[in-house]
Amino acid sequence: MEVEESKNDASVVASPAPTKLPQKRFYRQRAHSNPIADHSFDYPIHPDDYDWSQHYPTIGDKRVEFADIGCGYGGFLVTLGEMFPDKFAVGMEIRVKVSDYVMDRIQALRKLNEGQYENIACIRTNAMKYLTNFFHKGQLEKMFFLYPDPHFKKAKHKWRIINSALLSEYSYVLRQGGLIYTITDVKDLHEWMCKHIEQHPAFERLTDDEVKADVLSEKLLDSSEEGKKVTRNKGDKFVAIFRKI
């Protein structure tokens, strides 16, 4: 069971920039964390109360527009930073050591590539509880749910990151025309996510042609560390993208 941290220990500020990329073996942690557990997090009461400049040196009066929910070790987040240098993307990760790794990774990338990767950051938080504390209504253009915890037991399905109640929150922070991207190697979870999102009145599923035309559809497959692992294990990958209407 994950040990609780004091509020100060849950700081989202990364350690001083390392001189080389961190190694994952020093940040190992269990694959998933209980989202219902009473962890301690720093979070703003209102989005206006949050100082995004602590993460993004050049953000100025701009806002974060991409959110990678459960960003893992940050592979896809880094890809977003490279593909969209003029957009600000945040990864939200509940696990302590994993979020520490992503923060240190970003700091190292910035130091090794001057002027780059200043548009991505990671925050340790529970997005299932505090998403609307960070984002205004209609703020986000894209949300990503890559290989979320499948919570296989039926009694734990209510903990899945895609459910009817949370979809209303995602709809709130997404702008009209904004997109939700999902990918998993678990067919049952894929069908669950598609069923719940398609049944929600705020969303419609993209056609196969629309998915293929999206510049990120291929990146969903192998940019993340989990995606690479599934590829190595020759597993299936199920992709679906949804638009807020």
From Swiss-Prot:
Classification via PROSITE patterns: SAM_MT_TRMB
List keywords of the entry alphabetically. Methyltransferase, Nucleus, RNA-binding, S-adenosyl-L-methionine, Transferase, tRNA processing, tRNA-binding
> What is the annotated localization of this protein?
Nucleus
Q: Where is the active site?
A: 149
Q: What is its EC number?
A: 2.1.1.33
List positions binding S-adenosyl-L-methionine: 70, 93-94, 126-127, 146, 224-226
Q: Name one GO molecular function term.
A: tRNA (guanine(46)-N7)-methyltransferase activity
GO cellular component terms, A-Z: nucleus; tRNA methyltransferase complex
Q: Which reaction does it catalyse?
A: guanosine(46) in tRNA + S-adenosyl-L-methionine = N(7)-methylguanosine(46) in tRNA + S-adenosyl-L-homocysteine
Tell me the Pfam families matching this sequence.
Answer: Methyltransf_4 (PF02390)
So, what pathway does this thing act in?
A: tRNA modification; N(7)-methylguanine-tRNA biosynthesis
* Known role: Catalyzes the formation of N(7)-methylguanine at position 46 (m7G46) in tRNA.
Q: Which family does it belong to?
A: Belongs to the class I-like SAM-binding methyltransferase superfamily. TrmB family.
Q: Which NCBIfam families match?
A: tRNA (guanosine(46)-N7)-methyltransferase TrmB
Q: What is this protein called?
A: tRNA (guanine-N(7)-)-methyltransferase
The scientific name of the source species is: Aedes aegypti (Yellowfever mosquito)
